[in-house]
């Protein structure tokens, strides 16, 4: 019996902060592996998502949002991570918000001019455009900025046109063996996913009160004798006032964050979880490259 030819390739998902890159990746994979928030720059690491369908395997890299502001060490590192993801891929999906184009979009576009891989422009959030007649002038304008492989309007939130985007992706995959088993959806560890889930809940339940000077370190992740994951998470903030925001009145906010995070972990890991959270002040961690290295923001 002749073996079927298989196809595999790497695809970078890039764009400015808060255009729906992580939502798009989660929709393609059919489950959440990249955290989402209304706040900009939710994604801090390169998240790898793997989508295998028959003979095709697409390995997606969801990057931190590229932006102009680089005052803090963590912002510089996120920009560096996003830029390096563009270098060695088979296809780049450039996600933009169809409701408006800004200077950050222009900055990303300028980086893409130097990319070797073809670029697909995914115009997201078209469901938010009430007058669809406004979309055509937007497409006409951006189509003149770069020679795109394809331009496709999508709604990552609703799943509109995602199937057609995946068809475009398949045309860029190369003949070759699959890099991951077909049941893999990410190369990230459960420990890493636990920290990301906690961070997502922090951003959701602190609203605009808490800036991005917060991170999560998993101090313990083990399966106990009863088959329950015991997870201890340390939440690091930069100031005492931020610690109080996270804990909330009588510890209620921290309790809510913990409950919601535990429920998400149990769904993702398909296992019971016992989660404990602590909050600690670590001044200046987001500007300290040694601290960022120890927290996993810099690859050794």
From Swiss-Prot:
| Membrane topology term | Peripheral membrane protein
List each copy of the KH type-2 domain by range. Answer: 206-283
What residue spans carry the region label G2?
41-45
Kindly indicate where the leader peptide sits in this chain.
none
Region G3: list its residue ranges. 62-65
- Alphabetical list of Pfam families matching this protein: KH_2 (PF07650), MMR_HSR1 (PF01926)
- Specify the superkingdom: Bacteria
Cellular component GO terms, alphabetical: cytosol; plasma membrane
Q: What keywords is this UniProt entry annotated with? A: Cell inner membrane, Cell membrane, Cytoplasm, GTP-binding, Membrane, Nucleotide-binding, Ribosome biogenesis, RNA-binding, rRNA-binding
| Residues that hold GTP according to the record | 15-22, 62-66, 124-127
Segments forming domain Era-type G: 7-182
Q: Which GO terms describe its molecular function?
A: GTP binding; GTPase activity; ribosomal small subunit binding; small ribosomal subunit rRNA binding
Outline the segment boundaries, as ranges, of region: G5: 154-156
- GO BP: ribosomal small subunit assembly
Q: Where is this region: G1?
A: 15-22
Where in the cell is the protein located?
Cytoplasm; Cell inner membrane
Main localization, broad class? cytoplasm
Give the residue ranges for region: G4: 124-127
Family, per the entry? Answer: Belongs to the TRAFAC class TrmE-Era-EngA-EngB-Septin-like GTPase superfamily. Era GTPase family.
According to its UniProt entry, what is the function of this protein? An essential GTPase that binds both GDP and GTP, with rapid nucleotide exchange. Plays a role in 16S rRNA processing and 30S ribosomal subunit biogenesis and possibly also in cell cycle regulation and energy metabolism.
Quaternary structure and partners: Monomer.
| Name recorded for this polypeptide | GTPase Era
Annotated source species: Histophilus somni (strain 129Pt)
Q: Which gene encodes it?
A: era
């Amino acid at each position: 019996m002749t073996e079927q030819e298989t196809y595999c390739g790497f695809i970078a998902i890039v764009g400015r902060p808060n255009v729906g890159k992580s939502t798009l990746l989660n929709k393609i994979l059919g489950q959440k592996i990249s955290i989402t928030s209304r706040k900009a720059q939710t994604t801090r690491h390169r998240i790898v998502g793997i989508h295998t369908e028959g003979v095709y395997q697409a390995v997606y890299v969801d990057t931190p949002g590229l932006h102009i502001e680089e005052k803090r060490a963590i912002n510089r590192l996120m920009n560096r991570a996003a830029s390096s993801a563009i270098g060695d891929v088979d296809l780049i999906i450039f996600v933009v918000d169809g409701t408006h184009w800004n200077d950050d979009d222009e900055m990303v576009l300028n980086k893409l001019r130097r990319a070797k891989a073809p670029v697909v422009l995914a115009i997201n959030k078209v469901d938010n455009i009430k007058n669809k007649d406004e979309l055509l002038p937007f497409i006409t304008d951006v189509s003149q900025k770069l020679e795109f492989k394809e331009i496709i309007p999508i709604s990552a939130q609703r799943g509109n046109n995602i199937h057609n985007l995946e068809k475009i992706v398949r045309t860029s995959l190369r003949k070759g063996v699959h890099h991951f088993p077909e049941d893999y959806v990410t190369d990230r560890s459960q420990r890493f996913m636990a920290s990301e889930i906690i961070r997502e809940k922090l951003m959701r339940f602190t609203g605009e009160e808490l800036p991005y000077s917060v991170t999560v370190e998993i101090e313990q992740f083990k399966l106990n004798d009863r088959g329950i994951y015991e997870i201890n998470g340390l939440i690091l903030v930069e100031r005492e006032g931020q610690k109080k925001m996270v804990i909330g009145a009588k510890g209620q906010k921290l309790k809510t964050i913990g409950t919601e995070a535990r429920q998400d972990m149990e769904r993702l890991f398909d296992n019971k979880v016992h989660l404990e959270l602590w909050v600690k002040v670590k001044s200046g961690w987001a500007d300290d490259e040694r601290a960022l290295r120890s927290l996993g923001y810099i690859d050794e």
